[in-house]
């Protein structure tokens, strides 16, 4: 790699660290099959990428954006948040064949519901206990 090429690139991208990142990204793009904008002249991809940057034949802001996207670990997507109330409504729609416990028909059909008239069969008064004691004395 010629020193002249790097010095020409520093005029386009003053920060040498950023130059290395951008030139590396362009070299990876060339390896992936991107079209060359200068003649190869039997040079390797990093040298070709530096020559392209020095000549100004590549779009440097696009290369910088590609570097940023390549280094990102987590891409945050703005999605609307659902309320708990909306999620409950969705649960009902997702289970059309399953009856929910909140339905009155389901509560009556389960056989475990105590109705108002069911208590009348039981005699819970105190005289019921006395009748059994009197029967024992006889």
Curated annotation (Swiss-Prot):
GO terms for molecular function: DNA binding; DNA-directed RNA polymerase activity. It comes from the Bacteria. Keywords: DNA-directed RNA polymerase, Nucleotidyltransferase, Transcription, Transferase. Gene3D superfamilies: 3.90.940.10. Its EC number is 2.7.7.6. Pfam families: RNA_pol_Rpb6. This is DNA-directed RNA polymerase subunit omega. Residues 101-138 are annotated as: Disordered. The RNAP catalytic core consists of 2 alpha, 1 beta, 1 beta' and 1 omega subunit. When a sigma factor is associated with the core the holoenzyme is formed, which can initiate transcription. GO terms for cellular component: DNA-directed RNA polymerase complex. The keyword Transcription applies.
């Amino acid at each position: 790699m010629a020193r002249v090429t790097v010095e020409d690139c520093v005029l386009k991208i003053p920060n040498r660290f950023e130059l290395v990142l951008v030139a590396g990204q362009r070299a990876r793009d060339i390896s992936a099959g991107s079209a060359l904008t200068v003649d190869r002249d039997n040079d390797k991809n990093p040298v070709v990428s530096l020559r392209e940057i020095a000549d100004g034949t590549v779009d440097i802001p696009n290369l910088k954006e590609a570097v940023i996207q390549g280094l990102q670990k987590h891409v945050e997507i703005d999605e609307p948040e659902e309320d708990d109330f909306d999620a409950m409504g969705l649960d009902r729609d997702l289970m059309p064949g399953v009856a929910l416990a909140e339905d009155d028909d389901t509560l009556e059909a389960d056989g475990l519901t105590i109705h108002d008239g069911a208590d009348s069969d039981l005699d819970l008064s105190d005289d019921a206990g006395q009748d059994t004691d009197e029967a024992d004395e006889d």
